[in-house]
Amino acid sequence: MTGPGASPEHSSFGNAVKWSLVMNIGNQLTGTIVLLVIAALLGPEAFGTVALATVFLLFVQLFLEQGLTTTIIQRKTLTDRHLDAAFWVILATAAMLFVGTLSLAGWWAEVNHAPNLAGVLRVMSPIILIQALTVVQQALLQRSLSFKALAIRANTASVIGGAVGIIAAFAGAGVWALVLQQLVTQVIALVLLWAFGMWRPGLRFSRAAVVDLYGFSRSVFLGKVGTFVQSQLDSIIIGVSFGPVAVGLYRMALRIARTIVDAFSQPVAMAALPAFSRLQDDPAELDRTFRDSVGRSAGLVIPLAAGAAAVSDLFFRLLGDEWSGAAAVLVVFAVLAAARSVNNLCLPLLQATGRPGVTAVLTWSLAAVNVGVFVVVASLVGDRGAPGQALAMAVGRTAPFTLIYLPITLALAIRMAESSFRGILVAVRPALFSVPAIVVGARAAVAVLDPYLDDLGMLLVAVAVGGLAGGCVLVTMSPFWRGALTKALLVIRRNPPTAGT
């Protein structure tokens, strides 16, 4: 049963991945480019202030969504009364969370030593109400693998919001340029989502439907709260302990690494959850799809993360001297991005096979470890200055995830998919072998050209040389990437560029 809101023709998994990639690549890259332009004009303190407001809103939105997105996607049987009940519960919850956010904004600014934060958070608080109107619609489009509509919506909103933010920054709006960019993006995304979505809520509420949905979503929600703790607690501790400048350096490096993951791995994971759910009763096909998904995710993320690490010093020098302390932080987060490229496929597999409770336990276990690590690290680096504080916290976040959490989730996913470590290693091997080629190629280009080019010129050449070296390794070792290159060349040959009109 497809359930309400599904499109008449379901897209294939491959087509869903393609449009999910278009959505996330465009959205993430546009958003990151906009932030980089604005950050170069404003500096780490303004960026850190908005980041702290965003962390607060992300926490609030956990209680808004309550794991219902995954529940709507995963359920085999879904009716209109389920959707109506979810919509009205979410909307009522949003109203209460909105009022609570307005009340707590002053306290949040005080504990983070950022006086401007209170006003920023209050102005950004309508995002809570906007998000409440998107949860069910977006889940239905994901459930039906309608990622083309989601891609158009996300990219259009990101471009319009980004343009407004950049114009405001050049006009001297300061920190409010970042705030305006986020608000405009959210409003445009909401309008387009309801334009594309076929479902509309009915004026009815079923308590039985709520109970039915929350039986599964509770475990998903607990897992998402744990994910928030492990992914956002570091920013909170940095803000409380060191202030917005350290937060700005830390979050900028994290944003770049996360952009790589969100743009190139998350689309595969988003398409994988409904695909894995449909293959619950076909172990052989589930194993094959799981390995293919891990290989695609790693093949996209790991080379890009290696490249970002290799040129991080050049990149941040271009933003300005006050950002140079973020270069070493990005190197550490490149390792985290590589680990997440594999882990991002383990979690949807466990959810699709009916094990959301397992992911919740694992996520909370890592969160508990992270709490201890962050508190200890923060107490040891108080006198090291913002760059040293940000770097130490980055190591404290990356090490437990890579050395503890990933091996456990991967082992469980392999068991549920009836796969093998060897199969996963074969899938990620081309990406791993591309890393030394990328790093050596990029740094060699920098060493040779340093006397002749400025930072921008060296950055462009280093990216080109490192990318070519890594691409050669991927194409040589991976049939999938070799086939992708062949298809791309065929498309170019069939549609050659024309000179003039």
Enumerate the language-model features and the residues they cover:
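Interfacial segments at transmembrane-helix termini and the short loops linking adjacent helices
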Residues: 105-124, 291, 308-338, 384-389, ...
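Transmembrane helical elements of multi-pass membrane transporters/channels
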Residues: 16-31, 178-181, 185, 189, ...
